[in-house]
Amino acid sequence: MSAAVADGLTAEYVQLQPGPFTGQWTVVCTRTTVVQIGREDVAVVRRLRVPRRRWAVIVPLIVPAAARWNASAMRPQDVLICAPGTECFAFDPPGTRFAVLTFATSTTTSTRLARLAAECAPSGVATLRDEDAAALGEEILRLGTRGRSHAVDLGRLFRTCLMRATPRMRQVDSAVGRSQIVQRVEEFCRRHAGEPLSIAQLSSVAGVSERSLRNAFYDVYTTSPKRYLKLLQLHQVRRALRAVCGEDGTVTNVATLHGFYELGRFAGEYKALFGEAPSQTLHKARARKPSSPLGLA
């Protein structure tokens, strides 16, 4: 689904429950706005990066109470404002549905977003009026089915929602620090892919105690750092297998490059999570054209 994300956004998904990934991503482009509607049928961790010349607003459509966006529980009337060049982190339970609205930094809507984001700092969580949130959700869903012809009404409604939005209560601000801990650890793990990393080492990198590290991961991703990083490794292998060109790449080479040396155990964990053996992933990648990436990335 990452391959379907548009308007300069980049997304990474880490699947938390076993089985084939299923979901949907709909993109509607207008003159001033890109509306992207996502649905995930399995529990995932989602990491979204916003380009430097875009503002992004993430709107909950159907979001279970267990969901966490930047370590904050999101209510139906909340939206998450993501400034240009930033990242947001989410745990989405099965059945989560949301929309991402993006605006160029040169638009008048972005001017209002900048003011509201400053008021909501550092959490970025703003609260809409109940009636505004309900109307916005309905318009987004209509746009997803009717397409671009309905976008003018959505743009007007969204600007009205922004004018009447308020910052969420400050108790969510502590979530920002936990998101930063997770971000530092993830970046370190990506730079040291394939190396054995201990929880003690990761807590030192993050500058917190092991207990604080565990709490941060549970708050942001609702799972332990050890389990999350193992799943991240498996996804890195999956991406690498899908990117293999020609006959030189092998499952063994890719797996060991990412720190998996017990190949039988690795193959079992991989198949349990993704519903197919790593050799099947590699075979499909070789059969596909390089310009046609599919599925979860």
Describe each model-derived feature in a short phrase.
Residues 219-220, 272-273, 284:
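Alpha-helical DNA-recognition elements
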Residues 227:
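Short, basic-rich loop-to-helix N-cap that marks the start of a DNA-contacting helix
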Residues 231-239:
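Alpha-helical structural segments
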